[in-house]
Amino acid sequence: MKCPFCNFEESKVVDSRATDDNTTIRRRRECLNCNKRYTTYEKIEDFPVLVVKKDLTRENFNKEKIINGLIIACQKRPVSRKQIEDIAYEIEKSISNRMVTEIASKDIGEMIMDKLKQVDEISYVRFASVYRQFKDINTFLEEIKNLVVN
């Protein structure tokens, strides 16, 4: 690694530690030529996951979209911001663990509903009504019936 002060290419690592979120390693280095210290960060290279939408267009996965959808579904319900962020984080990790470059928006929606059902059933029905595009009250009743049976 080149020293930012003198461009010498050799250095030694003086200190190394993980950042708070454990996704990056912070290293303090000392140049073997000028003896000045500098900080570098080492991180695993992320490959963006593309979401394939119903109309077959693709866009980058965005955890914030999940959070925003959950905030709307959970409005005036006993669901904390932390619970919402935890759901979004778990879904993001699940997608990342699949090691895929593309995922269908349908799959993400199902993952959200599975998690939301465990947290708050009313929020689940709200989310499902928009996600599954309920057309009438009978569709609502059918979903609630399935929720009660399971």
Curated annotation (Swiss-Prot):
Cofactor (UniProt): Zn(2+)
UniProt keywords, alphabetically: ATP-binding, DNA-binding, Metal-binding, Nucleotide-binding, Repressor, Transcription, Transcription regulation, Zinc, Zinc-finger
Zinc finger (unnamed): 3-34
GO MF assignments: ATP binding; DNA binding; zinc ion binding
Gene designation per UniProt: nrdR
Family (UniProt): Belongs to the NrdR family.
Stored InterPro entries: ATP-cone_dom, NrdR-like_N, RNR_NrdR-like
BP GO terms, sorted: negative regulation of DNA-templated transcription
Task performed by this protein: Negatively regulates transcription of bacterial ribonucleotide reductase nrd genes and operons by binding to NrdR-boxes.
A Pfam family per the record: Zn_ribbon_NrdR
UniProt remark on cofactor binding: Binds 1 zinc ion.
Protein name as it appears in the record: Transcriptional repressor NrdR
Boundaries of every ATP-cone domain copy: 49-139
